[in-house]
Amino acid sequence: YFHQLGYSPLEIASLFLFYEFFGVITNLIGGWLGAKLGLNRTMNIGLALQIIALSMLAVPTDMLTVIWVMLAQAISGIAKDLNKMSAKSAIKTLVPSGEQGALYKWIAILTGSKNALKGAGFFLGGFLLSWLGFSGAVIAMAGVLLAVFILSLCYLKGDLGKAKQKVKFSQIFSKSPSVNILSAARMFLFGARDVWFVIALPIYLGQVFGWDHLWVGGFLALWIIGYGIVQTLAPKVTGKAQGKTPDGRAAMGWAGLLATVTALIALLVTFNLSPQITIALGLMIFGAIFAVNSSLHSYLIVSYAKEDGVSLDVGFYYMANAMGRLMGTLLSGWVYQTQGFVACLWVSVAFSVLTT
């Protein structure tokens, strides 16, 4: 839509900078807050901020300036990252120590259901918009979140995830080599996805293939739903059913497979071999392999994180995740604008290789 309004790919990417930048800061600080105050508080702060962000969008249309919407988007991004970090850290405290198979299963379910619901949200948002109008839709969503917020205040344990020892602010940076290596891999993994998925792909589908907004939005929404479903199945795919719990070597192998598939897509598009079919099918295969990578990484960070103050390591890791999204989004706009879609795919290949 913004591309049709005359925005360049790089200008479109810049619209997301506020959101992604605050994701980096939120995860870094949020992990420390979770360990210091407890994950129940960071979860509730996130819910409250999301209600505020939605309420900001319920103002009259003439007040919905670009700055106002970007501010609401930034608050919403902070809220989302606080809730995600809190939920994934909490699983470490709820699953009995040593039960790595159960930990992997619950991390995969949480990660996959989150993304499947995100995809379903595209369709639900469209339904609410047509039924209640824009203001009515955001008010309805804020109302549902308010009910969840009240339940969270009543039922979440007060000491959930709170570190037993004093937590210094300097501890926001991980001292664990395993966490640092995994965080760097996560940064390049999500950079590999977003460098062609966020800006380049939607514009390419509309500009080159002539797809309208409904087709592009519906296709990507269904992709996200399928991506989430595959994430929930990742433990079965990676061998948990045979009693094996994957490790860092497994993550390297899946990242290598992702790089191979992306390189194959790039080659086929470079030589103009049925590009529309190649991208549609290639994106499905890429999404399935990426989903396993993402779910596997999400399990490994919670497994590697120390028991006391788990959110410190998880927050640092998801800071790297947000940094990868920020890097990928910026490059998606700039590389597509200057070099084209195929170049975005080759940058994705390079990032996938670095993930290994």
For each predicted feature, which ranges?
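Central cavity-lining transmembrane alpha-helices of secondary-active solute carriers
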Residues: 14-32, 221-234
